[in-house]
Regions:
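Structural recognition of the beta-strand scaffold that forms the well-ordered cores
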Residues: 79-81, 97-101, 108, 135, ...
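C-terminal motif of bacterial Sec signal peptides marking the signal peptidase cleavage site
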Residues: 19-21
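Middle-to-C-terminal accessory/interaction subdomains
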Residues: 57-61, 68-69, 73, 201-253, ...
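Bacterial N-terminal signal peptides that target proteins for export
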Residues: 2-11
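Internal "kinase-insert"/substrate-recognition segments embedded within catalytic cores
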Residues: 87, 101-103, 124-127, 141-242, ...
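Short, solvent-exposed loop/turn and secondary-structure capping segments
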Residues: 91-93, 110-112, 146-148, 156-162, ...
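A conserved helix-loop-beta module that forms one wall/lid of the active-site cleft
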Residues: 106-137
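Conserved NTP-binding catalytic cores of kinases and kinase-like/nucleotidyltransferase enzymes
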Residues: 23-113
Length: 395
């Protein structure tokens, strides 16, 4: 009798869990950018009207468009800075946020999955933007599904602003080495390494990073092996390296990251950024699967780490890969779970987005629909994981 009662209770618990998993998620928050001028103009005044669960909040802000190559698309990304620090969509409280149009990735998942995975690999050392899905309106007119992103800055990266060696660079060409970036691609003349913090007018840290690059170019193998772990956090670098391999992000080898140093006592670390190039698509949205793979030889740091006879970097890389596979973080099951969680959140919103921005619109290489993009990710994992297992000796 007791056994039957136990079984009945267990069945009720399972049914309750199943019912809970089938419940629809809460409606997505909406961000309405209200302004008299076009958001395509730089840093215009606006009001952010934030709606969530029937509650409305309004905050004065300044907004501007953002993005490099993505600016050619009609669906635009934005960044805005409010007068006060607020938490939007459950993200950490701050004044500045990014609204990523996510136009080229029709799954809306590449950035979020990669950022979440990188942080989970090592929460203390691997930083990336926290993200949430929102809908966006411009002056009350629906503009699509967006990814709201935490802005990476001195606060979110944990810098000690009182330390003279705290610094941030966005997409610094430090790994180009002697193949210096063509001046036409330098965004700010006089700021070759794209210093983000401190303000270059207050203190120019380009010389500091130039010295780091010169060390990587000229140090003999013995000196390089002895000193490189004091300059870069190699645990963080290995995780970055492996994530690039796992996702097949060739663009991310030389750019699409923040390089930051918290203070005098911590080495440089990488915070990842921009993973459109992932899970079977390249950075422009063209289908590639594993036809092309990242070229790590062109990255000054990774090339020297992999080929230094005094370092056991390749062994460490394989050991870390094994740990990630054994833990389940680098597995199809893990990514499938992340896909399901994100799909549950946005599935009811993608159709309207693609009514506004058709799947065969400007800039797309094909007319794959949302469901087909998810299938691309799954097929990619079926190909890539066995490749990496063989390459890195995982059994």
């Amino acid at each position: 009798m007791r056994k039957n009662r136990f079984m009945a209770n267990a069945i009720l618990v399972l049914l309750a869990m199943a019912f809970a998993s089938c419940e629809k998620p809460k409606p997505l928050p909406n961000i309405d950018i209200v302004s008299e001028a076009s958001p395509r103009e730089p840093k215009i005044p606006c009001v952010i009207v934030y709606s969530e669960n029937g509650e409305i909040m309004m905050e004065n802000a300044r907004v501007k468009t953002r993005g490099g190559a993505s600016c050619v698309f009609h669906k635009i990304s934005y960044t805005f800075k409010m007068d006060h620090s607020l938490s939007l969509a459950g993200l950490p409280k701050q004044k500045s946020y990014i609204l990523n149009a996510n136009y080229i990735d029709k799954s809306f998942m590449h950035h979020k999955i990669c950022f979440d995975l990188f942080r989970e690999m090592n929460p203390l050392k691997n930083l990336a933007s926290e993200c949430a899905y929102v809908t966006v309106s411009l002056n009350g007119t629906y503009n699509g599904l967006y990814v709201l992103m935490q802005k990476l800055n001195a606060g979110s990266l944990g810098l000690n602003k009182k330390d003279s060696l705290a610094m941030i660079f966005k997409d610094p060409p430090v790994f180009f080495g002697e193949n210096r970036l063509d001046p036409q691609w330098v965004q700010e003349p006089g700021n070759y390494f794209q210093q983000n913090y401190p303000d270059i007018e207050d203190e120019d840290m380009n010389g500091y990073l130039e010295n780091v690059m010169q060390f990587m170019i000229h140090a003999d193998d013995s000196t390089f092996a002895r000193e490189i772990g004091h300059i870069f956090d190699l645990e963080n670098i290995i995780d970055w390296h492996l994530l690039l391999m796992f996702t097949n992000n060739g663009d991310g080898v030389m750019k699409n990251f923040y390089l930051y140093k918290r203070d005098s006592h911590t080495p440089f670390r990488i915070a990842i950024w921009d993973y459109d190039d992932a899970f079977g698509r390249d950075g422009e949205g063209e289908l590639k699967m594993t036809e092309s793979l990242p070229n790590f030889e062109r990255c000054l740091l990774l090339n020297r780490l992999e080929n230094n006879p005094f370092l056991d970097y390749n062994t460490l890389l394989k050991q870390r890969y094994k740990a990630l596979r054994d833990s389940g973080l680098f597995s199809k099951k893990k990514i499938e779970r992340m896909i399901r969680d994100n799909d549950r959140t946005i599935r009811d919103y993608v159709e309207r987005n693609f009514e506004r921005w058709p799947v065969d619109g400007y800039g797309y290489y094909d007319a794959y629909r949302y469901e087909e993009e998810i299938e691309v990710m799954r097929k990619y994992l079926d190909i890539r994981i066995p490749q990496l297992d063989a390459e890195l000796g995982y059994h």
